[in-house]
A protein has these predicted regions:
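Interaction-mediating elements
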Residues: 19-145
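Single conserved hydrophobic/aromatic residue that forms the stacking wall/gate
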Residues: 1-16
Length: 145
């Protein structure tokens, strides 16, 4: 016997969850102005492969992926949240001076490949596989390799 698929609350919830996490390709000109300026200032010679707007419940963020594999993530205001330069180094112009000084003093041969920031801290991944965590006053609070 044929049974029609259920349209219970579970199905409605599943559809809403899928809709709640939505990635949409956008043009670079649709990024917040501060994100556009950041790209021009620090990644001006890089070619954008894709820019995406991510909507997750009530929050919004933006991803920019370059043809060289570098990736930027911005919050809804266009402030950078993550800079990931797998095959090169994060431009020193975007690394906070105290973090840059700590890295150059303690790991002079290492490059910063990735830096993330949020409301609590900065996380830095180096080319020598060390991972450093700084609080918002740039005090080293954790180290891992």
């Amino acid at each position: 016997r044929d049974v029609a698929p259920s349209r219970g609350l579970g199905d409605v919830y599943k559809r809403q969850v899928v809709k709640a996490n939505d990635d949409k390709p956008i043009k670079v000109t649709q990024l917040p102005q501060s994100a556009q300026q950041f790209i021009k200032s620090h990644f001006g010679n890089s070619k954008v492969a894709i820019a995406k707007m991510e909507t997750d419940w009530l929050d919004k963020s933006y991803d920019v992926i370059f043809t060289d594999g570098n990736k930027l993530e911005f919050d809804k205001q266009g402030n950078w949240k993550e800079i990931n330069c797998k095959y090169s180094a994060v431009p020193t112009s975007v690394i906070p001076a105290p973090i840059l000084k700590y890295v150059s003093d303690n790991y002079p041969d290492a490059k910063v490949l990735k830096i993330e920031r949020d409301k609590r801290d900065y996380e830095v991944k180096l080319s020598n596989r060390w991972e450093l965590k700084f609080d918002l006053q740039f005090n080293l609070i954790d180290i891992d390799n």
